[in-house]
Amino acid sequence: MNYFPVFADLNNRPVLVVGGGTIAARKVNLLLKANAEVRITAQKLNAELTALVEQDRIIWIAKEFHGEQIRNVFLVVAATDDEQLNEQVFQVAESRQKLVNVVDDQARCSFIFPSIIDRSPIQVAVSSGGAAPVLARLLREKLEALLPQHLGVMADISGKWRHKVKQQLKTITERRRFWESLFNGRFSRLLKNRQIEAAKKELELQLTKDYQGGSVSLVGAGPGDAGLLTLKGLQEIQQADVVLYDALVSAEILDLVRRDAELIFVGKRAQGRQVAQQETNQLLADLALQGKRVVRLKGGDPFVFGRGGEELEVLAQQGIPFSVVPGITAAIGATAYAGIPLTHRDYAQSAVFVTGHRKADASDIEWQTLARSNQTLVIYMGTLKAATIAQSLQQYGRAASTPVAVISQGTQETQHTQIGTLKNLAELAEKAPTPALIVVGEVVSLHEKLAWFGEDKFAQKRPHFTLDSLRIERVA
């Protein structure tokens, strides 16, 4: 290795920065995060550094550099656009065996600044040794996204308990297993949810040998495209012991689940295999009570026609910790991939989401509200009742010529979008593969212009709506 990675304690140690511009300010801010005593030499300071001097956070010691300024400092940074001055700083520092960094000049660096992921006291440094700074930055961005924000507080709390854990658990193996279980279990989840005091109590309980504490995370998988799964959702499924998934979760997303996790199908469809909701609710509770990290993985968003609230009510009644990771609901994802904006200043000032699959004792639908003009109506699970939906909307004032779309398998490679009018909605729905979403409203007329996803956009001739009259024409 060309550089030996070292973490330096700069707390109250003097560091000299030569330069007063933007690059110098960037280095100064990094050094201040480490509580260094920053001394500045520069002809003039930019506004940011001037403010730091006025706040007594840094010391402006001189306008001109001379060798004596290096005598009692721990590190030296040269951050000017004057090559001759940078060379002078480097030579003086080298002659006095001081570690020096000349910014953007690898040949004149006895130490370099890595890209930093800061979850203090947890820190990760990434460096290419100056060979590929952009690559190091890209790696840092990926790690930044993958490492949860609560790592720092987790390390802080754990550090304060190390002595007590060592007293109670006598062997290294016992302590290792304890910490691994703690960091991968309910303790971590509570910290993730910002429940600090509850997490401390959990740690104390974990020291009781017969204690087992599981938890449940309700995760929205999004509409199908694995790229639309959130980073937090990805973290959850890669830490799970058990994943209960439904029929709307794509195979691509299931491939991202931790390899040794148990996968349990609990899906339901309007027609086909069914798993009773009560059975799913109880299974979630039972698995958590066994001390397992359970993920309930749902298509779309768990709180949008996903019955997520019903499942969490059961967990709450039994005192089982849970968390929720929202997902992109189908109405958002599928319409975006179909080039249909849900709102548009000229055509729709509101959007309404409804389900076509309701409880048997559900109250009557307010068709008059749903049939309003200047709004977009999105119907989940409505293809089997498309004829009734079309008839009712027309009965309450929606024109038969109102544009409609039936989007099947939204955001996936197999996505298929059919365009028509309210008059022939039932016919479109009958041909639509499931799962499918119905969109009703003038915004559908923008599909032909804004569609961007899927090769069939260019391979097929679709009905075209003129934006003023909404009269159906055929593309010549």
Swiss-Prot record:
What is the name attached to this protein's record?
Answer: Siroheme synthase
Species this chain originates from: Mannheimia succiniciproducens (strain KCTC 0769BP / MBEL55E)
Residues the record lists as Phosphoserine modifications: S128
Gene3D superfamilies annotated for this entry? Cobalt-precorrin-4 Transmethylase, Domain 1, Methyltransferase, Cobalt-precorrin-4 Transmethylase, Domain 2, NAD(P)-binding Rossmann-like Domain, Sirohaem synthase, dimerisation domain, Siroheme synthase, domain 2
Catalyzed reactions per annotation: uroporphyrinogen III + 2 S-adenosyl-L-methionine = precorrin-2 + 2 S-adenosyl-L-homocysteine + H(+); precorrin-2 + NAD(+) = sirohydrochlorin + NADH + 2 H(+); siroheme + 2 H(+) = sirohydrochlorin + Fe(2+)
What family is reported? In the N-terminal section; belongs to the precorrin-2 dehydrogenase / sirohydrochlorin ferrochelatase family. In the C-terminal section; belongs to the precorrin methyltransferase family.
Any Gene Ontology biological process: methylation
Q: What is its EC number?
A: 2.1.1.107, 1.3.1.76, 4.99.1.4
Region span, Uroporphyrinogen-III C-methyltransferase:
214-476
The GO molecular function terms of this record are: NAD binding; precorrin-2 dehydrogenase activity; sirohydrochlorin ferrochelatase activity; uroporphyrin-III C-methyltransferase activity
